[in-house]
Amino acid sequence: MLAASRSGLSVTELAEKLHTSKSTSSRLLASLVESGLVERDEAHRHFLDVRFWTWGVQAARRLPVLDIARPHLASVVKEWSNPASIAVVRGDQTIYLECLTPSNGDAMFNILSYAVPAYACAPGKAILAFSSDETKEAILSCPLKKFTPQTLATREELSRELETVRCQGYAINRGEYYDNGSFAAAVPILDHAGLAVAAVSFYGLQDEESLQRLIPPLVEIGEVISASLGYGKAVRDVVG
């Protein structure tokens, strides 16, 4: 709950979300603050300490999807000579775990650990569009900061965008977090239940033509990786 709240939570707000008393909520938060896992600001609002994000990144790097995705993504990076990334959503943030860059006809892996608001980047939108209603509502119900003129900063705009992403199967970012003139496209990696566990993306695309050219192979890679995680198996078993 703290992870999904960019503005933090007060004792009363946490008590309401946990359906418990204010005294219980207060004791819990006080214990977490004392242990250094939660920070309290001057307005007595509470936020997760940065070490939670560090632990989250470390845990995410052990996800099986990374081992499955790497060879497929390396292949498409070499073929199209365009950098790509693998990301997950934790709380309200998209955490970029790894990127692959073309290098002398090969693909070079680089470990990342930076975060971007999930609603303001292609991987985040791709994951949110295929997440549970509860996960989407946690983002939609929070204030959405406008980083650039392109940022989807209202509930209505973001809801429409996520529906579009879900229908077409991929997300596009045209400078919604940092407008440097380049584009990015991302597709979700789906588990056996059809929920997104990660996203892969092409970034640094310089024009609309490059964007449209690379979407089909990106979608194909997403489908291949998702199938490796069991997506579609339940349907095939029923039909078969």
Could you tell me what each predicted segment is?
Residues M1-L66, S226-Y231:
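N-terminal helix-turn-helix
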Residues A3, G124, L128, S132, ...:
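Short amphipathic alpha-helical signal-transduction/dimerization elements
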Residues T24, R51, I68, E157, ...:
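Charged catalytic carboxylate motif
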Residues E42, R90, H192-A193:
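Short, ordered coil/turn segments that flank beta-strands lining enzyme active or ligand-binding pockets
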Residues F47-C142:
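Amphipathic alpha-helical effector-binding/dimerization core
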Residues F147-T148, D179:
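Intrinsically disordered, low-complexity polar/acidic regions
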Residues T154-S228, G240:
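Extended hydrophobic
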Residues A234-G240:
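Signal-transducing coiled-coil/dimerization helices and immediately adjacent hinge/linker segments
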